[in-house]
UniProtKB/Swiss-Prot annotation:
Protein name, UniProt field: Eukaryotic translation initiation factor 4E
Function per UniProt: Recognizes and binds the 7-methylguanosine (m7G)-containing mRNA cap during an early step in the initiation of protein synthesis and facilitates ribosome binding by inducing the unwinding of the mRNAs secondary structures. In addition to its role in translation initiation, also acts as a regulator of translation and stability in the cytoplasm. Maternal RNA in oocytes remain in a dormant state as tacc3/maskin outcompetes eif4g to bind eif4e, thereby preventing translation. During oocyte maturation this complex dissolves and eif4g binds eif4e to allow translation of maternal RNAs.
Keywords noted in UniProt: Cytoplasm, Initiation factor, mRNA transport, Nucleus, Protein biosynthesis, RNA-binding, Translation regulation, Transport
Localization terms from the record: Cytoplasm; Nucleus
Subunit structure: eIF4F is a multi-subunit complex, the composition of which varies with external and internal environmental conditions. It is composed of at least eif4a, eif4e and eif4g. eif4e is also known to interact with other partners. tacc3/maskin competes with eif4g for binding to eif4e.
Record family assignment: Belongs to the eukaryotic initiation factor 4E family.
Disulfide bridge map: none
One annotated GO biological process: mRNA export from nucleus
Top-level taxon: Eukaryota
One Gene Ontology term of the molecular function aspect: translation initiation factor activity
Annotated mRNA binding sites: 52-53, 98-99, 153-158, 201-203
Region (Disordered), start-end ranges: 1-27
GO cellular-component term (any): nucleus
Length: 213
């Protein structure tokens, strides 16, 4: 089906184009679309000769749709990262660590992937997670979202959305339900929310879930 050419409602611009030989660019073509929040993308590479903080590096900050895509299309996909690496996307001013003031009373909705899912699901899930964050997809509870992390690990990758207050049940459960739906997870798949305090003090290999959806 042939595209319909838009009508030129400004004959003056056509005359100007003829005289100068240059196309007149509409302001709409270069105006960027602002996001509600400014975001920071971090990269972690596990070098055992360095401290944890020294391994964490700020890549870039952005606050428009166009700058997000410019950054996303410039960096490696999560599935191509070396084992032991992380990407973290957090609101500007919040560092991707439990100790941050905005994180220390919070927790995370955790998605655990098996090895086969790295090829099929990891990049798709992570991009959808980023879309949920920058698009403020959790309605009035988006303010509770701090950021998200993807951990690339040999034994199985993980993706998590971090929230600021694990005791805020309404916000946490709403975020979890929306997130599960956005990822397209089947109803029979259960995802859990863990507080950072429980994760930091766990005695076994698993942390108890505060909430599940």
């Amino acid at each position: 089906m042939a595209a319909v050419e838009p009508e030129n409602t400004n004959p003056q611009s056509t005359e100007e184009e003829k005289e100068t030989g240059q196309e007149i660019v509409s302001p709409d073509q270069y105006i960027k679309h602002p996001l509600q929040n400014r975001w920071a993308l971090w990269f972690f590479k596990n070098d055992k000769s360095k401290t944890w903080q020294a391994n964490l590096r700020l890549i870039s900050k952005f606050d428009t749709v166009e700058d997000f895509w410019a950054l996303y299309n410039h960096i490696q996909l999560s599935s191509n990262l070396m084992s032991g690496c992380d990407y973290s996307l957090f609101k500007d001013g919040i560092e991707p660590m439990w100790e941050d003031e905005k994180n220390k009373r919070g927790g995370r909705w955790l998605i655990t992937l098996n090895k086969q899912q790295r090829r099929n699901d990891l990049d798709r899930f992570w991009l959808e997670t980023l879309m949920c964050l920058i698009g403020e997809s959790f309605d009035e509870h988006s303010d509770d979202v701090c950021g998200a992390v993807v951990n690339v690990r040999a034994k199985g990758d993980k993706i998590a959305i971090w929230t600021t207050e694990f005791e805020n049940k309404d916000a946490v459960t709403h975020i979890g339900r929306v997130y599960k739906e956005r990822l397209g997870l089947p109803a029979k798949v259960v995802i859990g929310y863990q507080s950072h305090a429980d994760t930091a003090t766990k005695s076994g290999s698993t942390t108890k879930n505060r909430f599940v959806v």
